[in-house]
Swiss-Prot record:
Sequence ranges assigned to domain Kazal-like in this UniProt record: 25-78
Disruption phenotype: (Microbial infection) RNAi-mediated knockdown results in increased dengue virus type 2 infection rates and increased number of infection foci per infected midgut following infectious blood meal.
Disulphide-bonded residues: C31-C56, C33-C52, C41-C76
Signal peptide per UniProt: 1-22
Stated name of the protein: Kazal-type trypsin inhibitor
Induction / repression: Expression in midgut is not affected by blood feeding.
Domain of life: Eukaryota
Protein localization: Secreted
Main location: secreted
């Protein structure tokens, strides 16, 4: 019976470490995204290959610090000349 308690304790510790590691990967901008090219434009005027990669960057420390957002469901190069219309303004 004691072995089962030790096993459960080790399993619980491993699960906690796995969750903490996964969270820190997302905060560093490391995400498992599909390799599908459906470009989107971020408020930093950078084109991301797909929405998942942009969301990953948005959830990173740098993305949160810069208030990164999606401004268009297309490549930034394809936006009209008046890009400021797409960027959300803070009031």
């Amino acid at each position: 019976m004691r072995h089962i308690g030790v096993f459960v304790g080790v399993l619980a510790l491993a699960l906690v470490l796995l969750v903490v590691e996964a969270r820190s990967d997302a905060e560093r901008g490391v995400c498992a995204c599909p390799r599908i090219y459906m470009p989107v434009c971020g408020s930093n005027l950078k084109t991301y290959n797909n929405d998942c990669l942009l969301r990953c960057e948005i959830n990173s420390d740098l993305g949160r610090a810069n208030n990164l957002r999606k401004i268009a469901d297309q490549a930034c190069d394809n936006l009209t000349d008046n890009v400021n219309d797409f960027i959300p303004q803070e009031y």
